[in-house]
Amino acid sequence: MTKKNLAVCSFCGRSEKDVEKLIAGPSVYICDYCIKLCSGILDKTPAPATQEIATSSTSSPTSLRVLTPKEIKRHIDSYVIGQERAKKTISVAVYNHYKRIRALMQDKQVSYGKSNVLLLGPTGSGKTLIAKTLAKILDVPFTIADATTLTEAGYVGEDVENIVLRLLQAADYDVARAERGIIYIDEIDKIGRTTANVSITRDVSGEGVQQALLKIIEGTVANIPPKGGRKHPNQEYIRVNTENILFIVGGAFVNLDKIIAKRLGRTTIGFSEETDLAVTNRDHLLAKVETEDLITFGMIPEFIGRFNCIVNCEELTLDELVEILTEPANAIVKQYTELFEEENVKLIFEKEALYAIAQKAKQAKTGARALGMILENLLRDLMFEIPSDPTVEAIRIEEDTITQNKPPVIIQKSPEAIA
């Protein structure tokens, strides 16, 4: 085995030649040195796996503060541009979900239904960001999973229950907190079909994953292996009740608009052309989605039936992409401006340049995700040179910098300022 191919400890980086033992796990390794180190830490503090195994929250009813839908949306607005309908819908769903938990903790006679959410929309439209922002607002454990990595029992891949393990880890193994957490599952549409073409024929293993997810989404007491991986006899488990975990799933559902149009008796001629009219028509159709459309797409009825909130995230407009660049609390332009300010250099973006960046992102068809890549490629060389050049006072990004690959305008300091 060459040095390049030597297995190394995932924690300390020692290779298998530098340690006595190297234990392999799912895509990770741990050496005997790190095991001894962890053992010493665990001897001083109770190990999560040996703590009392709880299956329900023991917090008092007053410990759970429930924000109003308007408060939730106002916080989301600070980070997510556009998607007004989606933000309102999800704010109400989250509000009702946590009212439900509080009612259960207070032993009220009337119980509320669970408000799991299905987000439809193209890549980069803000589905994942909405879920991440919710987790920050509500101060609850949050984890993201990719549906394409999940497999049903008996297949090689990640068990569905490992999603709950990741939520438990995000809660520092506090079972009560994990049972009030949020799980976001992305690419959910990819487990409903076998090809990129719309078909009513479902992939057998994909349907199996939907069945496995259905169990934890509708609520069950899951036996979670503390270390992950496949279950085996004589293994210790942590019991987690998933009944009050909020599940949000998202997917692009490509060509779902054609299924809806067929049901409504409309034509989709010209939808392959990415014109503003075509995008608007597609968004209007997705806003009319019904359960039967998702079933035709390839999702099983029982799975879709667990999501009483189905909402469409519309494709971002040019103006919204520009707003994303500059307006949110963590806007990308603000981040880069701050980085250059630390070098005492002012970074200036002309308005036309911002629109050119937004247009370039729109052409990439990955929504807001393309914005960061465009700016990184644009500013990488400058970030390399500027720390070693005390003569630069400001950098101006013009439209030609984006559209014609012209260098940014470098404004030098006056000789007096340098001296």
Swiss-Prot record:
Keyword set, alphabetical order: ATP-binding, Chaperone, Metal-binding, Nucleotide-binding, Zinc
- List GO molecular-function terms, semicolon-separated: ATP binding; ATP hydrolysis activity; ATP-dependent protein folding chaperone; protein dimerization activity; unfolded protein binding; zinc ion binding
Zinc among the record's keywords? yes
The keyword Chaperone belongs to this UniProt entry's keyword annotation: yes
Q: Enumerate the residues binding Zn(2+).
A: C9, C12, C31, C34
Q: Which residues bind ATP?
A: P122, T123, G124, S125, G126, K127, T128, L129
Under CDD domains, the record lists:
RecA-like_ClpX
Under the heading Pfam families, the entry gives:
AAA_2, ClpB_D2-small, zf-C4_ClpX
**What is the superkingdom listed in this entry's lineage?**
Bacteria
Of the GO CC terms on this record, one is: HslUV protease complex
* Signal sequence, start to end: none
Q: Where is the ClpX-type ZB domain?
A: 1-50
Q: Which GO terms describe its biological process?
A: cell division; proteolysis involved in protein catabolic process
What role does this protein play? ATP-dependent specificity component of the Clp protease. It directs the protease to specific substrates. Can perform chaperone functions in the absence of ClpP.
Question: What HAMAP family is this protein classified in?
Answer: ClpX
Assembly and binders: Component of the ClpX-ClpP complex. Forms a hexameric ring that, in the presence of ATP, binds to fourteen ClpP subunits assembled into a disk-like structure with a central cavity, resembling the structure of eukaryotic proteasomes.
Family the entry assigns: Belongs to the ClpX chaperone family.
Its name, as the record gives it, is: ATP-dependent Clp protease ATP-binding subunit ClpX
